[in-house]
A protein has these predicted regions:
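Amphipathic, Lys/Arg-enriched alpha-helical patches that create a basic surface
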Residues: 217-250, 263-295
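Generic structural signal for well-ordered, non-transmembrane alpha-helical segments
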Residues: 43, 47-50, 91, 98, ...
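Charged/polar positions within long, soluble alpha-helices
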Residues: 54, 58, 149-160, 246-257, ...
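Ampiphathic alpha-helical segments that act as solvent-exposed interaction surfaces
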Residues: 25-69, 273
């Protein structure tokens, strides 16, 4: 498997129908790259197929190019390590948001529906505390924060690893590193970039902004201050992101339940996190980076 599961290979037994269609044997080697696969991923796939043919001979079928035709690398943009890293991080973040959204799209709970259809308002408010769906939506708030932390934290780590200006700033950095961390770096179990990233709290907007402004000259607060249309509502993205962070904090540390958190409200929060990611990616592109999101 390649970085971020962009490139995969596996051996499996094919059906009789597939054997007839592709004129192949019972067992085949199947390789694939996601649509976000880079020049390097396609190159690796070609190399794998060449080695397999040297060992086992036979033919192969390429979905895009036909029988015994290797992928034409000239058809793919060659990304820098930074561009590839951010593309994978952003794609993974958006994909996870899409998965939870699809999961909730068909979710229904008969008990919740019964409570919602009650005509007596006072009884409805009382029974909200027993609504299993409200518990579910509240418990999913930390998931959204995990996406934000992953996206901003890992993008930051990639920048300070590959961006020349950010790396030059590391020269003047005074950071105390414990012996355990030094050993982990020497054994390649950790990296200096990840250790520096760990010194910031990427569940906190002020901390995110501090890290990005110091090393990347990127003002995240300014980027997220835009007013955008999210699920037919005009919102200030920064305000909604702070709502998500605050809700997660109250839920995790105080078990504070928001009994007004509906399915639609949670779906709006998902869309807000996606909007924040896309706005930030757009700011990266304005710096001249080529970034592709597979979603």
């Amino acid at each position: 498997r390649g970085l971020g599961d962009v490139y995969k290979r596996q051996v499996y037994k094919v059906s009789t129908e597939e054997r007839t269609k592709y004129k192949c044997s019972e067992w085949i080697l199947h390789t694939r790259t996601r649509s976000s696969g880079s020049y390097e991923d396609k190159q690796k796939q070609n190399e794998t197929i060449r080695k397999a043919r040297q060992l086992f001979e036979g033919t192969f079928y390429n979905d895009w190019y036909g029988t015994n035709a290797y992928t034409n690398l000239n058809d793919y943009t060659k990304f820098s390590p930074l561009e590839k890293g951010i593309s994978i991080i952003a794609s993974n973040s958006i994909e996870k948001l899409s998965q939870i959204e699809n999961c909730l799209a068909g979710y229904k709970n008969e008990v919740s529906d019964s409570f919602a259809n009650m005509n007596i308002e006072s009884m409805k408010e009382l029974l909200k505390t027993k609504d299993p769906s409200i518990m579910l939506y509240n418990s999913l708030m930390p998931f959204l924060v995990a996406i934000l932390e992953y996206f901003y934290g890992q993008c930051f780590a990639n920048f300070i690893k590959y961006d020349t200006n950010a790396r030059n700033l590391l020269i003047d950095e005074k950071l105390k590193i414990g012996i355990a961390d030094v050993i982990a770096i020497l054994q390649k179990e950790n990296s200096l970039e990840q250790i520096i990233a760990q010194s910031y709290n990427f569940q906190n907007l002020d901390s995110i902004n501090k890290a990005y402004k110091k090393y990347l000259s990127i003002d995240v607060m300014s980027i997220l201050s835009e007013r955008k249309k999210v699920n037919r509502k005009i919102i200030r993205v920064l305000v909604k992101i702070q709502e998500i962070l605050d809700a997660r904090h109250r839920f995790v540390h105080e078990l504070d339940i928001n009994y007004n958190l509906t399915k639609q409200a949670y779906l709006d929060y998902i869309a807000t996190v996606e909007c924040a990611i896309l706005l930030t990616v757009e700011s990266f592109k304005q710096r001249g980076l080529k970034i592709e999101i597979d979603h």
